[in-house]
């Protein structure tokens, strides 16, 4: 959870999201509590009444992600999300966001071209929706991971 005083001090900065065409929700996937962080941000976006803005989830630090070891012979311990592989997280979040998630390592430059192309594609979608006869300003590109 984000401390309340921190949220209050950044309220004016956060109000800028009202003007944004696209939100990039950057998440540190290597942090053990990253899902709680996502929930906190989503609550804040709901408070600001911008939870329905187009959003691209950006899961960063894939190079640092380590799943907790799981012993399949242990009959007491259930396998939880802390044991998910990076691939399992990708499948989970691609499903939850209907494909609006990218997994990158900014430090290692992994998947950065894909990230740039997805941002371009999302902005292009917004532009074409608003200005249907100006689609030539944003030529279509191939987006492959």
Which residues does each PLM region occupy?
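Inter-motif core of Ras-like GTPase G domains
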Residues: 6-31, 43-50, 105
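C-terminal-of-GTPase-core extension/linker across diverse P-loop GTPases
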Residues: 32, 36, 40-145
């Amino acid at each position: 959870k984000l401390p309340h005083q921190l949220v209050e001090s950044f309220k004016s900065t956060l109000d800028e999201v009202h003007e944004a065409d696209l939100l990039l929700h950057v998440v540190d996937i290597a942090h053990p509590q990253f899902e709680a962080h996502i929930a906190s941000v989503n609550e804040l976006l709901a408070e600001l009444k911008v939870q329905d803005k187009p959003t691209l989830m950006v899961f960063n630090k894939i190079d640092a992600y380590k799943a907790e070891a799981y012993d399949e012979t242990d009959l007491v311990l259930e396998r939880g999300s802390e044991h998910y592989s990076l691939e399992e997280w990708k499948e989970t979040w691609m499903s939850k966001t209907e494909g609006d998630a990218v997994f990158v390592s900014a430090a290692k430059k992994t998947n950065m071209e894909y990230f740039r192309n997805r941002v371009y594609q999302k902005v292009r979608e917004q532009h074409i929706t608003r200005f249907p006869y100006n689609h030539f300003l944003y030529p279509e590109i191939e987006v492959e991971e």
